[in-house]
Swiss-Prot record:
Molecular-function annotations in GO: translation release factor activity, codon specific
PTM: Methylated by PrmC. Methylation increases the termination efficiency of RF1.
Name by which UniProt lists this protein: Peptide chain release factor 1
Family annotation (HAMAP family): Rel_fac_1
Modified residues (N5-methylglutamine): 235
Family named by the database record: Belongs to the prokaryotic/mitochondrial release factor family.
Main location group: cytoplasm
Location within or outside the cell: Cytoplasm
Top-level taxonomic group: Bacteria
Gene from which the chain derives: prfA
Keyword set, alphabetical order: Cytoplasm, Methylation, Protein biosynthesis
Species name: Paraburkholderia phymatum (strain DSM 17167 / CIP 108236 / LMG 21445 / STM815) (Burkholderia phymatum)
Amino acid sequence: MKTSMQAKLDQLTTRLAELNDLLSREDITSNIDQYRKLTREHAELQPVVEQYGLWRQTMNDAATAQELLSDASMKDFAEEEIRASRERMETLESELQKMLLPKDPNDDRNIFLEIRAGTGGDESALFAGDLLRMYLRYAERNRWQVEMMSASESDLGGYKEVIVRIAGEAAYSKLKFESGGHRVQRVPATETQGRIHTSACTVAVMPEADEIGEVEINPADLRIDTFRASGAGGQHINKTDSAVRVTHLPTGIVVECQDDRSQHKNKDRALKVLAARIKDKQYHEQHAKEAATRKSLIGSGDRSERIRTYNFPQGRLTDHRINLTLYRLESIMEGDLDELIAALVSEHQAELLASLGDAD
């Protein structure tokens, strides 16, 4: 293990001991905000320090076995013990490296998932509906909560654009690599000649901004229009101006919400989506220079970048960023995304490790 890495782990071990002392103090436990902050830090450090403890114990086992080599009757046992200990130390060190990787501050946030139909007309809108269903099934598997924020349905079903809020543990960390262009190849229901058509949708995954102060929005920068909701009809449709369109004048970002009968609720939802879009725009602008100097294999999350192809005739999904092909499209469209997401996370971790190695 590198000296710098061991020094860092020693610092974390000391800090965990400090936290144990702090969390037992009455003045800390009576301060709810401070107590929560320290408890969160403790929860992050404890598994790292425990892993480091296993590494040190294994190193001590190897040192003890080394001393036995001079004893002829114990030599074979000692050599096997040394070999096993070194293998275990390598595994533990590799795991520790991943645990020390810089944590994305957005990983624990809830998200807004936006799907837009692209090229392909009605078929693209139908595929947008299929993608939404896939993500909703995945959310169910993770016991996340889903709230429809805005939906613009197409004439034949599916969506021209749809935005949902997904709330739950690690939602952003698991879905953040879904941003980009998703291409579908299949025979549309309206195709009489059996020809395969290609269409596309774009997906954007945006971390939800904090309620207070994270994204400053000056009310003077907003234009808020109300209009009558459009939809499939019904007694409440088009009788009141409940739909809301919010335009952020400095950026030109426009958000429409009309799913609720309450204008107030639609406005509140639109402002939440707007804050997430502004935060997302700021994030990508900040990382533009870095992306230009070191092109990430996973990609920047730019929705114009084609990241994946869904080939229905072959039952095949291909993620172009990591050259991964899976021949179980049916289960994937039912929300079985674990293998795919794990592969993307693993590749991202490998990239981070490589970049840290370059920095050393």
